[in-house]
């Protein structure tokens, strides 16, 4: 992964990190953090494994503490970390929330329009991309619905990502990463998730950007 000289780093962009992961065949873990102790624990584990890490906050987390607070918390920890650390907005629920995290200094933004129809998802995603890219902040989007209950959203049974739609979505939005639904389930869910790896392979054939599960 990206080498940090001198053992001291600031927050890094997720784009270079995930492109390096894609090129070299490894995954980067992303963890929701909701207080100082969680931030410290995740970074300690990442350092023990000598692994880059993505720290992320969700819309419900930002309801009780502002994006500035969490940015300052993670940025302070990142300065002392000896591994690359990304600050990411997870499942951004609106353009306004995405911009709040962007202005706070987050180095990676997700806008989740997967609960909207295809064209609306494209529109809101492109609006966030157009706002973030001039400042070199990468954007993640989601297509299809991930099952289970994560944050304060219920994904239900989940709707699989269509490979052809994924290719069109990426081309029309210019998004940097795409979260896809292949049977994955996050948080609390019923039953045992069954991953459609063939579908993942088909998406990979037509989408060149890093994929998020």
Describe the role of every protein-language-model region.
Residues 14-20, 35-60, 68-84, 92-213:
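Alpha/beta enzyme core
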């Amino acid at each position: 992964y990206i080498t940090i000289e001198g053992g001291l780093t600031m927050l890094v962009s997720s784009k270079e990190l995930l492109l390096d992961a894609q090129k070299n065949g490894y995954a980067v873990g992303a963890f929701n953090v909701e207080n100082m102790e969680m931030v410290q624990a995740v970074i300690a584990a990442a350092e023990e494994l000598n692994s880059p890490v993505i720290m992320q906050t969700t819309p419900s987390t930002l309801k009780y503490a502002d994006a500035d607070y969490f940015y300052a918390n993670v940025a302070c920890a990142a300065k002392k970390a000896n591994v690359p650390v990304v600050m990411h907005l997870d499942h951004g629920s609106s353009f306004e929330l995405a911009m709040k995290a962007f202005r706070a200094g987050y180095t990676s933004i997700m806008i989740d329009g997967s609960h909207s129809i295809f064209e609306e998802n494209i529109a809101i995603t492109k609006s966030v991309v157009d706002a973030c890219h001039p400042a070199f902040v990468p954007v993640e989007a989601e297509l299809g619905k991930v099952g289970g209950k994560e944050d304060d959203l219920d994904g239900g049974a989940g709707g699989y990502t269509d490979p052809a739609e994924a290719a069109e979505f990426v081309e029309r939005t210019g998004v940097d990463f795409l979260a896809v639904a292949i049977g994955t389930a996050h948080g609390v869910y019923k039953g045992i998730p069954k991953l459609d790896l063939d579908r993942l392979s088909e998406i990979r054939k037509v989408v060149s950007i890093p994929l998020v599960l």
